[in-house]
Curated annotation (Swiss-Prot):
The entry's keywords: Ribonucleoprotein, Ribosomal protein, RNA-binding, rRNA-binding
Coiled coil among keywords: no
InterPro entries recorded: Nucleotide-bd_a/b_plait_sf (IPR012677), Ribosomal_uL23-like (IPR013025), Ribosomal_uL23/eL15/eS24_sf (IPR012678), Ribosomal_uL23_CS (IPR001014)
Quaternary data: Part of the 50S ribosomal subunit. Contacts protein L29, and trigger factor when it is bound to the ribosome.
Protein name per its UniProtKB record: Large ribosomal subunit protein uL23
GO molecular function, one term: structural constituent of ribosome
Function, as annotated: One of the early assembly proteins it binds 23S rRNA. One of the proteins that surrounds the polypeptide exit tunnel on the outside of the ribosome. Forms the main docking site for trigger factor binding to the ribosome.
Cellular component annotations (GO), alphabetically ordered: ribonucleoprotein complex; ribosome
PANTHER family (UniProt xref): 60S RIBOSOMAL PROTEIN L23A (PTHR11620)
Family that this chain belongs to: Belongs to the universal ribosomal protein uL23 family.
Length: 96
């Protein structure tokens, strides 16, 4: 099994993700090879909360150019984690 800190990369702080916190939904960038079960176990291990549901979205790389040089951005995977009703809040999102 992989280390939970290798699965969860960083929290996603956007206007929409802050609104979803009222529904106990938290958004994270996760490893592109992680599945829902691994994300659930990682969030529970790192933050000590109970996870009810995990939704995962894949983002394709975008084509970018700088002068004559063309390339692509990295592909991403984003997870929206819904906590149970009796679970505590995640502290890293407080005060943002």
């Amino acid at each position: 099994m992989r280390d939970p800190r290798d699965i969860i990369k960083r929290p996603v702080i956007t206007e929409r993700s802050m609104e979803m916190m009222a529904e106990k939904k938290y958004t994270f960038d996760v490893d592109v090879k992680a599945n829902k079960t691994e994300v659930k176990d990682a969030v529970e291990a790192i933050f000590g909360v109970e996870v009810e549901k995990v939704n995962i979205m894949n983002y394709k790389p975008k084509a970018k150019r700088v002068g004559r040089h063309a390339g692509f951005t990295n592909r991403r995977r984003k997870a929206i984690v819904k906590l149970t009703a009796d679970s505590k809040e995640i502290e890293i999102f407080q005060g943002v």
